[in-house]
Design a protein with these regions (language model features):
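Glycan-recognition and processing domains
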Residues: 1-17
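Beta-sandwich interaction modules
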Residues: 6-8, 19-34, 68-131
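Structural beta-strand segments of beta-rich domains
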Residues: 35-39
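Short glycine/proline-centered coil/turn motifs in the loop regions
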Residues: 44-46, 119
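Beta-strand signatures of extracellular beta-sandwich domains
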Residues: 49-53
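Short, solvent-exposed secondary-structure boundary/capping segments
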Residues: 62-66
Length: 131
């Protein structure tokens, strides 16, 4: 069952530098096996760091979460001519970022959430996922 759901809605910086969203079901929660999750992150003058975290446990504790690799839209060519996609764990914004960007993460994740840290300014308009 493909669906677009909100991981994190409209949030304005209030002086708190960290925020963790509620968890949402990933592919494995719904029995899908391709593991493809497409993210859309909409920011307005945001300064901080965003991580997408995942768990493969049905009832996760704090220790069951890990940082998912996020494949961006930047491509690189290595010395053999192979074209690869850049992969990140953190999306770090050290100057005000206003953008809407898409990323992919792949894994048979039961749960997915967003973790925001070092937030010093701006707005997170939304973080959505299509699984």
């Amino acid at each position: 069952m493909r669906a677009t759901i909100s991981i994190l809605g409209y949030n304005v910086f209030t002086g708190t530098s960290t925020l963790v969203s509620d968890k949402v079901g990933g592919d494995a929660y719904f029995g899908a096996d391709d593991g493809l999750h497409t993210l859309m992150i909409d920011l307005d003058s945001f300064i901080g760091s965003i991580k997408i975290q995942a768990s493969i446990v049905k009832t996760p504790t704090d220790d069951d979460w890990f940082n998912a690799e996020i494949a961006g839209t930047t491509f690189a060519v290595d010395t053999t001519g192979k074209v690869g996609t850049s992969v990140a764990i953190n999306l770090d914004y050290t100057s005000a970022e206003t953008s809407i960007k898409t990323y992919n993460t792949v894994g048979n994740f039961v749960w997915i959430r967003a973790s925001i840290s070092n937030w010093t300014a701006g707005i997170i308009k939304r973080i959505e996922i299509n699984r």
